UniProtKB/Swiss-Prot annotation:
This is Putative pre-16S rRNA nuclease. Its EC number is 3.1.-.-. GO terms for molecular function: nuclease activity. Belongs to the YqgF nuclease family. It is an enzyme of class 3 (hydrolase). GO terms for cellular component: cytosol. Could be a nuclease involved in processing of the 5'-end of pre-16S rRNA. The keyword Oxidoreductase does not apply. It is found in: Cytoplasm.
Length: 154
């Protein structure tokens, strides 16, 4: 189920279970995982498959393996806050994922996270090819970190 309110999302979470975040792109998905205490967000991996059934199966495997209790999906909106074509694509993906899992899904504003992730990797001296392979997972960890920071105050 897609939850629009962060407090409601938090209320539905199981104590001491991790969250995952997804940075959904047209060519790849970045995945990040929190620790059980939800104090740290870590890039997990990048899914390069574009077939939605395979992507959802991969996500279900991650959810089962790490005993995840909630999912955060980065919602790409433009700088003015307007909905874009990519926003609609991500919302449709979130709806499809919600049909496959019985976990709360929260959509988090992800403006500029992939660019920030790429800049962060660049500042560490990561080569362009490696940045492009990892920036979505790092962006997902930034999205997750934003939510983790917000729920500390709930």
């Amino acid at each position: 189920m897609i939850i629009k309110n962060l407090q409601e999302f938090y209320r539905l979470l199981i104590p001491n279970a991790p969250l995952i975040a997804i940075d959904y792109g047209s060519k790849k998905l970045g995945i990040a995982l929190s620790n059980q205490e939800r104090s740290i967000a870590m890039p997990l991996n990048t899914i390069t498959e574009i077939n939605k059934k395979i992507v959802i199966t991969s996500l279900l495997n991650i959810i089962e393996k790490y005993k995840v209790c909630g999912v955060i999906i980065g919602l790409p909106i433009d700088m003015s806050g307007a909905v874009t074509e990519q926003t609609n694509i991500v919302m449709k993906f979130a709806e499809e994922l919600a049909k496959s899992i019985n976990l709360p899904i929260y959509l988090q504003d992800e403006r500029l996270t992939t660019k920030a992730a790429n800049n962060l990797l660049k500042s560490f001296g990561v080569k362009r090819k490696d940045r492009n392979n990892n920036d979505d997972a790092v962006a997902a960890s930034m999205i997750l970190e934003t939510v983790l920071d917000s729920i500390k105050n709930i």
